Regions:
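Anion-binding alpha/beta catalytic cores of soluble intermediary-metabolism enzymes, centered on
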Residues: 1-172
Length: 172
């Protein structure tokens, strides 16, 4: 039987960091990040403009916010994108453009080890969420791509506090 408390306990012990590139344009993502922070499931990074996020949402304490436009590591991300995609014909200009894109920026945070994982696709097409990872993160023999929805909270139909995990079987 599925036991979310066991998953939370393991996640807390692992102390991983998850980046949310859609925070600047999705209230659902911000709320999910806050729940993860509050339940101490993982450390949370939002990609977006800090001043806009703080003005729009309350209680973002203990959430790291990184703005690709002003980040100290944006140039490094641009350089890495260019290096990784140069053989495929990417130009320096295109690498720069992609380094400002929240999904590409967050993907590179994972590739660089700043984050351990990324949650995307709530507001962005699956193809646009996966493309950067498939292009930029070197695959490993034991690695895989997974899609899963975890829903916290009181469900309208179920009527009580529940955690639901729903897999996306379209991604294998």
């Amino acid at each position: 039987m599925f036991n979310p408390k066991k998953i939370y306990k393991v996640a807390r012990k692992l102390n991983k960091t998850i980046v949310f590139p859609e925070a600047s344009f999705s209230e659902r993502i911000v709320e999910a990040g806050k729940i993860i922070r509050d339940k101490k499931i993982a450390n949370v990074i939002f990609v977006g403009d800090e001043s806009n996020l703080i003005l729009k949402y309350k209680n973002l304490k203990n959430i790291t916010i990184i703005n690709p436009k002003t980040s100290d590591i944006r140039q490094e991300i641009e350089d890495l994108i260019f290096e990784k995609r140069q053989a495929k014909g990417i130009t320096r200009k295109k690498a720069r453009e992609l380094s400002y894109d929240p999904i590409y920026f967050a993907t590179m945070l994972v590739e660089m080890g700043i984050a351990d994982g990324m949650v995307a696709g709530a507001e962005t097409a699956t193809s646009d969420s996966l493309r950067p990872a498939l292009q930029l993160i070197k695959g490993k023999d034991e690695g895989y791509v997974s899609s899963c929805n975890i829903i916290f909270g009181k469900h309208k139909v179920l009527g009580k506090e529940r955690t639901l995990v729903i897999g996306d079987s379209g991604l294998n």
